[in-house]
């Protein structure tokens, strides 16, 4: 899939923008603080209904206005789809082909994106919440039912934690009802995650071995707070541990086990990647991003859109070449932001170059 056209109204520093793109490489050049990242964020937001930079929707609204509108024309294998998101003080409205979508899981996945931004380099050593978010964003696009089950899980988790904080003593019967619901949704969330990580590991290892010229292997491990011996009995094990932890959870006023506390670990040649070099970290993240692209295509039959936000300067020539080889080979529409073309020596011919200045975008008259 690829985005043919994007229109922004009152988005960040863009008062109004209407732009068309190549199905291949699109490079956005400009000085810092001109709107390059805002532009990629808009594509990301149109896809996922959320920003990767802020949780506050009001920060996305142009300072002179009270509403935001984003519309995009997406070319999928199945045909053209129009997406639309409108933000105001009354809330958010999402539409597909002008039809309002009641559920997030009905909208997300229509346009798939993979974002590679400088903050992704913190994925290995950062907080577990970053790695859970990484899983949730990818898996939610590939399998929308996952988002629905995760939403139900979080709703019951909030109820359980609220009860634990307010209760003066344990009501075992009431907790048992919540435990059964939480274990049911939580087990399905974990099953989806485990399947996803197993599939991602195969793709990521293939890319990582290519980047390292066969010198390194990459493995991934889903680290669950729920102890279980096989995937088929997660529900029973989860339920048992919830029941066993009633006193502890009551004392701590929160739920001590479940997918909300799970993590993801990375290993290079069997060694924990926390102890890897900076160069190895870059190779690992690059392998993951290329694996995301490959896996989304393998599981959905359609390519995602790749967003590279000021990361090419973080990669040496070898890693740049490997990334662009994958992009070209897989025919992935790609958006690259940069302050200069100096470190993009490996770019092929036929790219579209756009110049970004103070919230305006101008296509280069000469296609490179």
UniProtKB/Swiss-Prot annotation:
Q: Where does ATP bind?
A: 30-37
GO molecular-function annotation terms?
ATP binding; single-stranded DNA binding
Q: Name one GO cellular component term.
A: cytoplasm
| Keyword Transmembrane in record | no
Give an example GO biological process: double-strand break repair
| Any Pfam family hit | SMC_N
Task: Decide whether keyword Magnesium is in the record.
Answer: no
* InterPro entries recorded: DNA-binding_RecF, DNA-binding_RecF_CS, P-loop_NTPase, RecF/RecN/SMC_N, RecF_2
Keywords annotated in UniProt = ATP-binding, Cytoplasm, DNA damage, DNA repair, DNA replication, DNA-binding, Nucleotide-binding, SOS response
Q: Which family does it belong to?
A: Belongs to the RecF family.
**Function noted in UniProt:** The RecF protein is involved in DNA metabolism; it is required for DNA replication and normal SOS inducibility. RecF binds preferentially to single-stranded, linear DNA. It also seems to bind ATP.
What name appears for this protein in its UniProt entry? DNA replication and repair protein RecF
């Amino acid at each position: 899939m690829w985005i043919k056209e994007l229109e922004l109204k009152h988005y960040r520093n863009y008062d109004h923008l209407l732009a068309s793109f190549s199905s291949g490489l699109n490079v956005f050049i400009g000085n810092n603080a001109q709107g390059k990242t805002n532009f990629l964020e808009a594509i990301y937001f149109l896809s996922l209904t959320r920003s990767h930079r802020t949780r506050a929707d009001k920060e996305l609204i142009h300072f002179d206005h009270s509403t935001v509108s984003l519309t995009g024309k997406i070319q999928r294998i199945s045909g053209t789809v129009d997406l639309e998101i409108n933000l105001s003080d009354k809330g958010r409205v999402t539409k597909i082909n002008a039809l309002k979508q009641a559920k997030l899981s009905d909208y997300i996945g229509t346009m798939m994106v993979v974002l590679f931004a400088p903050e992704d380099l913190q994925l290995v050593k950062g907080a577990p919440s970053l790695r859970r978010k990484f899983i949730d964003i990818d898996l939610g696009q590939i399998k929308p039912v996952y988002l629905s089950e995760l939403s139900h899980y979080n709703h019951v988790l909030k109820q359980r934690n609220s009860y634990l904080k307010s209760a003066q003593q344990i009501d075992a019967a009431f907790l048992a009802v919540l435990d059964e619901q939480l274990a049911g949704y939580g087990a399905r969330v974990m099953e989806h995650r485990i399947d996803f990580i197993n599939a991602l590991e195969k793709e990521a290892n293939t890319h990582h071995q290519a980047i390292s010229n066969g010198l390194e292997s990459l493995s991934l491990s889903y680290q669950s707070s729920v102890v279980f011996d096989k995937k088929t009995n997660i529900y029973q094990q989860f339920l048992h541990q919830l029941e066993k932890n009633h006193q502890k959870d009551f004392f701590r006023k929160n739920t001590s086990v479940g997918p909300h506390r799970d993590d993801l670990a990375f290993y290079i040649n069997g060694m924990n990647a926390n102890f890897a070099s900076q160069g190895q970290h870059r190779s690992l993240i690059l392998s993951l991003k290329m694996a995301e692209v490959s896996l989304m295509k393998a599981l959905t039959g359609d390519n995602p859109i790749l967003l590279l936000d000021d990361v090419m300067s973080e990669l040496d020539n070898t890693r740049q070449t490997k990334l662009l080889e994958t992009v070209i080979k897989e025919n992935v529409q790609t958006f690259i932001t940069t302050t200069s073309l100096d470190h993009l020596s490996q770019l092929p011919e036929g790219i579209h170059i756009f110049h970004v200045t103070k919230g305006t975008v101008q296509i280069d008259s000469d296609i490179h």
